[in-house]
């Protein structure tokens, strides 16, 4: 068992300041316990005070609006130079204990409250027994009182019946004393009450509303005095939702094409400013001739870069661009020219074979620089065989076409006039071809149109003229 003594004590400070805080040895002088302001304006707080011995003291101090102060209503002691504290002894604490077992509420300004229940431990059996005995005694007393009242009421009823038999009166005229026979209080009308005594939500019922209030707790149906004059009761409209939506959509789509004519007007205004050609037919012909003239130049330049083989003979170079420049003639003449062109292709193939053989025997060495010249590969047997077969196939086609047309003799005479190039001429042609390869493609393309084109097709033109 600890020898500590505990007492509830109320600390107070008079009215005036805004805040008052209590501090002391209980919180190591931290100032953590504020006093509660009461309705009177003063500050109070009730708290338990612990004392280790009877001779021990409880030291404390007040902090009023941030200033440490000492109250004159409590005892003072000097701890050191210039420092004073209030203190309480056991005698001061015992005097204030008015009610044993009562506690005070600090938030309520130190008001007393009932004895708090036990915080821990099982409830005592003696208190239970006492409560049971008290409850039994109360019940027995209530039973005795109820039996006495019943006896008295029965005796009074018997006496009244005897009196009724003597005087000739009935029990209906006599009022009983029991609760069942007591009449109910008569309901009082609100209108009869004094003007000051009225309900929170007064109800003013008029003659019109009383007729329509058929349902209890609700307004009821509304009866209109003139239903025939109201259009909503007579007119009925059947509206199709799809038709109505179509109409509305059509009406809304009208303002959309407004921007159309503005664009067209701008185009029409700008159109006359465009230049118009006087002779469009002549211009198209000139463009076509220019294209035909450029195509042979491209064909002549491309083999210099890509093909490893040498260029064909000058006669072949002259004959190819002339074929593109053939002027439109009648149908029979065009067919003849096509056949003659195929015959020249066979001659070109033969000239290429002769050039390849001559290059194998004698290689021409020149001092001119070589531009993009690929190494020459020897021809295989298959390639030579294909070269031999190609002129035979072309001759067979020529014969078939000659049989269909009646100009066999003219073609044979013209082909016999053509002479095959000799070995010396082939050497000269190879030297010229190597020089042309070293030259730039632009220079070759510019020099070609300056040469006079005298070949097979040139002779044909002279004949037709």
Swiss-Prot record:
Region (X-DNA-binding): 160-161
Family: Belongs to the CRP1/MDG1 family.
Composition skew (Basic and acidic residues), residue ranges: 337-363, 385-398, 404-428
Region annotation (Disordered) ranges: 107-227, 247-276, 298-465
Transmembrane feature ranges: none
Gene Ontology cellular-component annotations: cytoplasm; nucleotide-activated protein kinase complex; nucleus
Skewed-composition ranges (Acidic residues): 156-165
Gene Ontology biological process terms in this record: signal transduction
Gene3D superfamilies: Immunoglobulins (2.60.40.10)
Pfam family, one: AMPK1_CBM
Sorted UniProt keywords: DNA-binding, Phosphoprotein
Role description: Cruciform DNA-binding protein which exerts an enhancing effect on the cleavage of cruciform DNA (X-DNA) by endonuclease VII from bacteriophage T4.
Biased composition (Low complexity): 166-177
This protein's name: Cruciform DNA-recognizing protein 1
Cross-referenced SUPFAM superfamilies: E set domains
Residue numbers of Phosphoserine PTMs: 153, 156, 271, 319, 343, 394, 440
PANTHER family (alphabetical): 5'-AMP-ACTIVATED PROTEIN KINASE , BETA SUBUNIT, CRUCIFORM DNA-RECOGNIZING PROTEIN 1-RELATED
Keyword presence, DNA-binding: yes
Residue positions, PTM Phosphothreonine: 182, 295, 366
Any GO MF annotation of the entry: protein kinase binding
């Amino acid at each position: 068992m600890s020898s500590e003594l505990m007492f509830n004590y109320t600390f107070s400070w008079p009215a005036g300041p805004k805040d008052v805080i209590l501090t002391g040895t209980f919180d190591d002088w931290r100032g953590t316990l504020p006093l509660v302001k009461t309705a009177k304006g003063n500050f109070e707080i009730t708290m338990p005070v612990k004392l280790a011995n009877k001779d021990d003291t409880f030291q404390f101090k007040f902090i009023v609006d941030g200033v440490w102060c000492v109250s004159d209503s409590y005892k003072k002691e000097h701890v050191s130079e210039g420092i004073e504290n209030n203190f309480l002894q056991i005698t001061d604490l015992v005097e204030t204990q008015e009610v044993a077992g009562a506690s005070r509420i600090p938030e309520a300004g130190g008001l007393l409250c009932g004895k708090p229940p036990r915080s821990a431990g099982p409830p005592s059996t003696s208190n239970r027994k006492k409560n049971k005995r008290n409850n039994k005694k109360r019940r027995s007393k209530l039973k005795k009182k109820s039996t006495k009242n019943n006896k008295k009421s029965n005796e009074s009823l018997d006496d009244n019946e005897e009196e009724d038999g003597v005087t000739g009166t009935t029990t209906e005229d006599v009022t009983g004393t029991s609760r069942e026979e007591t009449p109910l209080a008569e309901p009082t009308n609100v209108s009869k009450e004094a003007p000051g005594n009225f309900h929170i939500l007064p109800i003013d019922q008029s003659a019109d509303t009383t007729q329509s209030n058929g349902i209890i707790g609700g307004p009821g149906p509304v009866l209109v005095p003139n239903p025939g004059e109201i259009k909503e009761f007579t007119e009925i409209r059947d509206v199709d939702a799809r038709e109505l939506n179509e109409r509305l959509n059509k009406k809304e789509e009208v303002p959309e094409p407004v921007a159309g004519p503005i664009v067209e007007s701008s185009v029409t205004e700008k159109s006359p400013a465009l230049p118009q050609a006087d002779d469009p037919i002549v211009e198209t012909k000139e463009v076509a001739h220019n294209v035909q003239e450029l195509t042979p130049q491209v064909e002549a330049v491309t083999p210099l870069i890509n093909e490893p083989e040498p260029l064909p003979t000058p006669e072949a170079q002259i004959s190819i661009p002339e074929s593109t420049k053939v002027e439109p003639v009648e149908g029979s003449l065009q067919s003849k020219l096509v056949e003659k062109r195929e015959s020249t292709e066979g001659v070109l193939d033969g000239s290429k074979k002769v050039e390849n053989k001559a290059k194998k025997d004698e290689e021409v060495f020149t001092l001119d620089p070589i531009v993009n010249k690929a190494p020459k590969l020897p021809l295989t047997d298959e390639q030579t065989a294909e070269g031999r077969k190609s002129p035979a196939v072309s001759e067979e086609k020529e014969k078939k076409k000659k049989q269909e047309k009646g100009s066999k003799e003219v073609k044979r005479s013209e082909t016999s006039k053509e002479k095959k190039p000799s070995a010396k001429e082939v050497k000269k042609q190879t030297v010229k071809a190597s020089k042309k390869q070293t030259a730039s493609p632009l220079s070759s393309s510019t020099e070609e149109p300056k040469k006079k084109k005298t070949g097979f097709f040139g002779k044909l033109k002279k004949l037709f003229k």
